[in-house]
Structures are given as C-alpha cells and as structure tokens.
Amino acid sequence: MMQDSSFQDLEPPECCIYKIPDKIKRRREFYTPLLFSIGPLHYGKVELAAMEMEKQKLRCYDKFCSRLYGTWQEEFKSFIQHHETRIRNTYRYISGTCTLSSDVFRKMILYDSIFILEILISYHEGGNDGILNQSFLKDYIIRRDLLLLENQVPYFILDELHKLLIADIGIYYEYPSLLTLSCNFLRIRMPKEILSMSKKEHDKIKVAHFTDLARSALVGILPRDLGISSGNFLEIF
C-alpha cells in the first residue's frame, strides 16, 4: 500500500534541532560553529575537525571517566543505543536524513555529551585545565557554539548522563542540578521562581536543548511545563 508523500514528509514528534535552509541565512557565520561541532549537522567538517577544541573532546572524555567508577559507561552506551531512533528523530535536515552508521552516530553522541557535561562541571569547579578560562573571548565562543540551534544534542541525553554522574559519586543533594550547571555556564539568569525550586523540581522541567533553554529564558516562560510565567526578561550574556 502506497503512502501519501505528504505524510512521509511529516516531522517525527521528537524533531527539535533543525538545519537552517541557506535561502534564509543572511550571514552563514551566525549559524555555523567556530570551534567545535555538536551532533550530526556539522559533524566531520574539515574546518572544525582541525580545531583544537575538537581534539579536546578526547581529553574531556578521559577526565570525565576519571571522576566515575562502576558501570556508568556501559549504562550510558546502552541508553544511547536504546534511544538511538529517538535521538536521530530530533534532527531535521534540509533534505534526506542522517547517513552516519549506528556505530559512528552513537560514538558521536557519547563523546559530545561527555564533552558538554565536562565543560559545565569544570566551570562549576572553577578549574583552569586548558579547556576553559584561557581567555574571555574563547569562553564566549564556547558559549556561543553551545547555543547554536544546528549544534545541539537533546537535553534528555545530558540529563541521563548527569543522573549517572551524581548516582555514581553519591552526592545528589550536594551537587547542582543540570539546569543550574547549564544556566551558570551559559550565563542564563534564572528567575526567582526557578531558584527557589528543589533539585527534584528542576529535574521535572522539560527542555529540548540549550537553544530551547535560552529561548525559554528570553521570553520569560521557563518552565513552561509547570505553568509558571515570569514577567522579567532574562539576560544571557
């Protein structure tokens, strides 16, 4: 039985990370990462692969692994494998679909997620390890790259990795929520309603990705799923 092509073109419900069509890009550099790629939309670009920050992903991976023990890595890989279709469905290409093999795709999500969370943790801990704090300009560009719509991983992946981290080291009530870590590094100011929430309430907030988090803060409806609306517009940088 043939399906109507209009139904085949429908976006899956998980879709939230888009490749911006060239015809509406007035300046390509506004949509293109400068230091590193996150996710499949800019994966493998020669000009990014040669950047030092791409090489730092391996270093971040090793540093993150040194924080944890147990079976967290196997659990996270299994989580990515189990949710691979859902993760792939979050990305929308101008034409076609992601052609990366499952092995390459899963490895990319693994390293990119750990890279992001290690950056958030390093910033929280105030460490000067060569990844952050070398210059104001570099930190600004890192934040800028992490906020680009085309340069995202789904937030639920970072959330799962964060849960494995705090479960492994056993400091749930002492360690900041992922929302707090993210807002602190990205310079997104949380309204008083959010600051007064418990970590468990933070965990209930639905975020699609960092661009969505920034958008929600700017329009004053974070968290929209809890029916809270703030009249205050928030500063990001």
Task: Place the predicted regions along the sequence by residue.
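Acidic, Ser/Thr- and Pro/Gly-rich low-complexity regulatory segments
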Residues: M1-F237
